[in-house]
């Protein structure tokens, strides 16, 4: 999680304005709104990345742009857009309505499902790739059952034995976790990867030695792995020919299942 608040998680249709932002209906129980920021593809949209940020176990406080959790994902979104935008890859970033997972309410998952509905309305049939950090990684895993989702990247995800693996069935999955993460459990991420590998289309797990939860150390590795994985999946689905960083194949060979960097 992105704040020191830990527990095992329970597992409107509006047009986009000129700023690329779009407001969702508030999550049930409060009036706060989720916001989507869109970096559009050049030309026809052939695929969409949905970027999901972290948060807290319980909080009804609204998420603001100044909060570190959504701000942390901006460089990832921009790098993906720089690398894939000209090839038809759009990048949508979701700012959740509230900061907490909130037990059975699963507030971020509600927001993510709303965002996926907006994407599919505008781009029916295109492949969708989910990229999430911390609580956003949990959200990505749970939202992956959407029929247009083809791949999931979960960075330092907040997973537990109760996290269902059914959502990633038939999906390509990359999980990355640091060895000195004191906020979420690398052991639980690895355990989930092993469980989910039985049904996922592919499962790759990367351990980053000396990296913590907030991706401050080895940032280029975090970004390179996420960008390379998404672009590789995008190219495989669409034959778009987006340029994959040369270093990606060295970091994570296609045949690799578990890698330590």
Residue ranges with predicted function:
Residues 14, 20-86:
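Short, surface-exposed "cap/lid" segments of acyl-processing enzymes
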Residues 17, 26, 197, 202-261:
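C-terminal catalytic histidine-bearing segment of alpha/beta-hydrolase fold enzymes
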Residues 64, 185-195:
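Short alpha-helix in the alpha/beta-hydrolase fold that links the catalytic acid
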Residues 102-122:
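Alpha/beta-hydrolase active-site loop
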Residues 130-132, 155, 176:
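Short beta-strand immediately N-terminal to the catalytic nucleophile in serine-hydrolase-like folds
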Residues 131-136, 140:
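Gly/Ala-rich beta-loop-alpha elbow adjacent to hydrolase catalytic centers
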Residues 148-159:
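A conserved short beta-strand
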Residues 168-169, 174-181:
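Short beta-strand/loop motif that positions the catalytic acidic residue
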């Amino acid at each position: 999680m992105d704040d020191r608040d830990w527990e095992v998680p329970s597992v409107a249709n509006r047009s986009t304005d000129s700023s690329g932002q779009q407001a969702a209906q508030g999550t049930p129980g409060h009036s706060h709104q989720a916001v989507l920021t869109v970096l559009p593809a050049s030309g026809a949209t052939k695929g969409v990345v949905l970027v999901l940020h972290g948060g807290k176990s319980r909080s009804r406080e609204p998420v603001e742009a100044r909060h570190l959790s959504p701000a942390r994902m901006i460089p990832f979104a921009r790098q993906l857009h720089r690398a894939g935008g000209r090839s038809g890859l759009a990048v949508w970033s979701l700012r959740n309505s509230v900061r907490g997972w909130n037990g059975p309410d699963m507030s971020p998952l509600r927001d993510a499902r709303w965002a996926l509905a907006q994407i599919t309305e505008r781009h029916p049939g295109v492949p969708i790739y989910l990229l999430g950090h911390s609580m956003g990684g949990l959200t990505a895993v749970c939202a992956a059952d959407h029929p247009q989702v083809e791949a999931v990247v979960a960075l330092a995800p907040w997973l537990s034995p109760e996290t269902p693996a059914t959502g990633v069935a038939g999906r390509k999955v990359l999980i990355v976790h640091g060895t000195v993460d004191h906020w979420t459990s690398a052991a639980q991420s690895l355990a989930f990867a092993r469980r989910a590998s039985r049904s996922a289309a592919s499962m790759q797990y990367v351990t980053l030695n000396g990296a913590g939860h907030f991706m401050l150390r080895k940032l280029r590795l975090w970004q390179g792995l996420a960008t390379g994985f998404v672009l590789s999946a995008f190219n495989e689905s669409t034959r778009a020919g987006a340029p994959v960083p040369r270093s990606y194949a060295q970091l994570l060979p296609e045949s690799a299942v578990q890698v330590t960097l």
